[in-house]
Amino acid sequence: MDSILRLTSILTWLLSGLWHVGLTATNYNCDDPLASFLSPVAYSSSSDITGSTSSAQLNWRMGTGGWSPADSSAHQWLQLDLGNRVEITAVATQGRYGSADWVTSYHLMFSDTGHNWQQYKQENSIWTFAGNLNADSVVHHKLLHSVRARFIRFVPMEWNRNGNIGMRVEVYGCSYKSDVADFDGQSSLLYRFSQKTMSTLKDVISLKFKSMQGDGVLFHGEGQRGDHITLELQNGRLVLYLNLDDKKAWLSSITPSAILGSLLDDQHWHSVFLERVGKQVNFTVDRNTQHFWTKGETEVLDIDYELSFGGIPVPSKPGTFVKKNFHGCIENLYYNGVNIIDLAKRRKHQIYSGNVTFSCSEPQIVPITFVNSRSSYLFLPGTPQIDGLSVSFQFRTWNEDGLLLSTELSEGSGTLLLILESGTLRLLIKKVTGHGTESLTGRSLNDGRWHSVSINVRRNRVTLTVDNDAVSLAPETSGLQIYSGNSYYFGGCPDNLTVSQCLNPIKAFQGCMRLIFIDNQPKDLISVQQGSLGNFSDLHIDLCSIKDRCLPNYCEHGGHCTQTWTSFYCNCSDTGYTGATCHNSIYEQSCEIYRHRGNKAGFFYVDSDGSGPLGPLQVYCNVTEDKIWMTVQHTITELTQVQGSNSEKPYAMTLNYGGSMEQLEALIDGSEHCEQEVTYRCRRAHLFNTQDEAPFTWWIGRSNERHPYWGGYVPGVQQCGCGLEESCQEIASNTGFLSSKDHLPVTQIIITNSNRTNSEAAWRIGPLRCYGDRHFWNAVSFSTEASYLHFSAFHVEFSADISFFFKTTALSGIFLENLGIKGFLRLEMSSPSEVIFAIDVGNSPIELLVQSPYPLNDNQWHYIQAERNIKETLLQVDNLPKNKREVSDQSNFLLQLSSQLFIGGTSSRQKGFLGCIRSLHLNGQKIDLEERAKITPGVRPGCPGHCSSYGRNCHNGGKCVEKHNGYSCDCTNSPFEGPFCQKEMSALFYSGTSVTYMFQEPYPVAKNTSLSSSAIYKDTAPSKEIVTLSFITAQAPALLLYLKFSPQSFLAILLSRNGSLQIHYQLSKVESHVFTVGSENLANRRVHEVNMNRNGQELSIQVDQQLFSYNFSPEVEFQTVRSLILGKVTETLVLNPEVTQANTLGFVGCLSSVQYNHIAPLKAALRHASIAPVTVQGTLTESSCGSMVESYANGVTTVYSSSDPFGNTDEHEPLTNAIQSDSAFIGGVIAIVTFIAFGVIGIMTHFLYQHKQSHHTNPMKEKEYPENLDSSFRNDIDLQNTVSDCKREYFI
């Protein structure tokens, strides 16, 4: 059996090869002149200056010397009857001899019958041929696609402005032989096999067909085991069903293998080519090809008994068919090299035919096309004053709206209108009195298919029939008296008519009509064309020029295509792409770019190839670290145990990352580093066989290859990383990282040694993690105008998008250029403020200009995005408005570039670009500029100076640091951290929390601070002081910040009893300055920002949005800072009563973004406590002040006191979020401390009162104290008395 299959496949291959050779031979040297020997009667035209068509052969000089119409206007044509169907490969034209008459451009049309013409198209557009520039020269055109027809028409489009239309023509080609079969819709051909079953590994089926209807079976075959192959027309499209040895199913329930073509019921020839090799199938209709893999269990197609063509007959029931039969003609039908129609014509025994004839009978149907939605119409006369009315026709269109018919009825009956509205037919009869009646029927009638419409009015009964579905008007029409009028306007109304003669409440119809009957009489539309019947405007007669603009579908990435008569539109919803053709991704290409655009950490979609074919993939971007990690999670994240596996029954688990391998590979290739953590734990289930070193366990990587090495070790070595480093803590456990990008990601793990007694294994594969974008900072520098980089030609064709960054100081320069045989593409900076995108697809160049209001040669990075698709061309610079231009419908949109792509210059080495270009993308493809620059003179890899453009991204005092592949933000001198110094450093303080920063030589983290910041380390007092902080609290009084100058002098920022902000400057034992800033209670559970700036004797204080200013007197002298304290001051110092009271309770709340000049003490305590001169006492918890605001917002607002700083009066309702447990503890501590404090204060008050009384009764020259009074308490008393006597208080 195998030998028979092999022999059958060889014969099929040979026969199909011979068939292709035969076709090639037919086209070989097919360039004979076909018009030279035609008789004059073979020429016809729309009109002629002599009254009868003159001979118009090439080089003809007799008579009028060629053809000229009686009137040089649109819709003139010259027609040739070539006698039989021939193959036309070229044409040539001249002007009329001895005259100023010639045609400068023209269209070609062809037909088999002299009716139902077809326009010559190239690249899916009506092709315009360039004509002559004088009367004598010959212009020759080789057709890109040969044409098979009997009749050919030359349709002048433009001609000599100083003359008229004049043509002499020649047609080149050769004879065309074919075998044709005509199917009447009730017959079929059967090809019986010599054996019961035909088994094939390869099939080749080819044919051409011309259909009279939109549905019908072209061929069908099936086998008893479920194999089947069926090709049929459905709604004007070809549907292929193909299945190999699968379970048998009814055809109605089978999903089509492929659907191709559209509008295939246009009565024109269409070619089909189907090739199958095993499960791989190539399916071509006309010039559209679809490649796919068929379903089934084998690669052999088994067909039993026969193949049927034209229908599917029911066995044992002659004349009965399963589905609708094909009605039309089939030509040159080949099945695996066998000419089926030739066998039928010769009545070979393999062929059984029904009522099939072998010539193509075609009805003489004349279609018309309404071209213009404003001015197209057709006027046809009718027979007036008939009691009743009858009109019928067929139409097809893509437009939802349009006027189909308008006629003024006789005897004052009113006006009858038939309108297409939102794809539904609306019949409206308007009476002269204003009353009327209407009916709606049909839906989606703008689907491009032919639809039949009939209006019949008889004996006051109005019936509207659409596609055999009849509907009658409402009962009130029984009183209507309707009499036919004498004029019928189809499609629209002329401008010169009165309203009553033709009504058009909607735009004119754009589409095709045919088979028009009025009063049951067919209308001769050729007579309309010749001017002997009716009238028309903007019509194509004897031609239906409908075009399916959604085939092929130019909406990319799964966009849904919809269309009108003149254009198509792409619905990009839920695709992840945008633009006129869904070409541009709405997602960024890496986490690096998301970070660069200011996004925070979270889940994002990353589209690694931008506008390329790969879709977006969801990842997690951790943008809070210096290295931006991109994480792709898979479906199995937990430690998984395995038991009972062996070499015969291995354990295998596949990991699903939620995307294709191509998406993952693109993500990995575009990253600088990738890794996956792997963990393997085992008991009596080894990784490797110690005898022959064969692996017991391995994993599968990206290339579907086995890898026996494990975490931390180099690829190709069967060992674990901890074994290499001799750092294994457990013999039965290994954890490490896989970091070979060529092998990642891990797609499968195999374990074969966990079936021994008491043996088990456990594994865990971590997510795929990558950092770095290899292309975002990929840059080159061009140093001379003659330097450039060159790459292979830019393959664009239908869509082209270009994007890159540039910076320069030059006045002009070309960014890139690519030339073709006819067209080109160029992007350049034409002046310091102008960028031009020029493109030519072969007809005429288009230039888009963007003018910038600012100079582009400022040595800053600027972004350019240019795009050209079949709908529009656009250019954008930075965030300036886009310059966009729609592409003309008739234009040639296929851009073919043949030369090399030049970056930074041109092949002429002139007008080159001086500066830097980076992150160049062409149609989503990332161009590695740096690698090419390494071997190119005059071009250097990399480009310094990123901080000049992106330094503004370093916030809150962060310093921009240059890197080869970008920049980073140094947050050393900032109270913030993170990639852009935007993450606030904040912490929760409790009543006993104290953070002390000692000023001395800078700690190692701050070694690179500027010279201006070094003043705070000297013994001299700083001339400037800047203090910034944010806080949230519900406690008052509260000490926020304390700066110690000496034991007796300090600066304190606190909240007073009423919650207002106070600044205390204690500059000596006797000199104090107190500033009360506003009266607002800031202990209100909200975040407040304080910014204090002292410059010399000037002091400014900003609280939130309010700014206050003050000037110190000139004699005030400031001192050197020794330490800075946040929270409670724990050491024994001389404090005034307000500071003492605020310090007694400490600070309970959240402090963030604390900075004194260039020192960030809170950040030092949280991040560098081991190396910075900072000491932390009590509990300091890193937190977020923002989360506390949310906690407060979710809680109950109550009145609070100093004993309850967070304001919880309801002891049964804890604080929400992260501070619930902490707040309970804090509240208890505060209550105890407050009780003790008030007790101490009470005792002190009592003692001082007694002491004061004795002091007044016994005056002393010097202060005297009891001998048993503690010395520290004496200092407190001194401080209080001094402050009471010398304090200066300011209210601002």
Swiss-Prot record:
Residues 546-583, 944-982 form the EGF-like domain. Residues 584-777 form the Fibrinogen C-terminal domain. It comes from the Eukaryota. One of its GO terms (cellular component) is membrane. Glycans are attached at residues 282, 496, 571, 622. InterPro entries: ConA-like_dom_sf (IPR013320), EGF-like_Ca-bd_dom (IPR001881), EGF-like_dom (IPR000742), FA58C (IPR000421), Fibrinogen-like_C (IPR036056), Fibrinogen_a/b/g_C_dom (IPR002181), Galactose-bd-like_sf (IPR008979), Laminin_G (IPR001791). PROSITE patterns: EGF_3, FA58C_1, FA58C_2, FA58C_3, FIBRINOGEN_C_2, LAM_G_DOMAIN. Residues 180-360, 367-544, 778-943, 987-1185 form the Laminin G-like domain. CDD domains: EGF_CA (cd00054), FA58C (cd00057), LamG (cd00110). Keywords: Cell adhesion, Disulfide bond, EGF-like domain, Glycoprotein, Membrane, Repeat, Signal, Transmembrane, Transmembrane helix. GO terms for biological process: cell adhesion. Disulfide bonds join 329-360, 512-544, 550-561, 555-570, 572-582, 916-943, 947-960, 954-969, 971-981, 1150-1185. Residues 25-1223 are extracellular. May play a role in the correct development and proper functioning of the peripheral and central nervous system and be involved in cell adhesion and intercellular communication. Belongs to the neurexin family. This is Contactin-associated protein like 5-2. It comes from Rattus norvegicus.
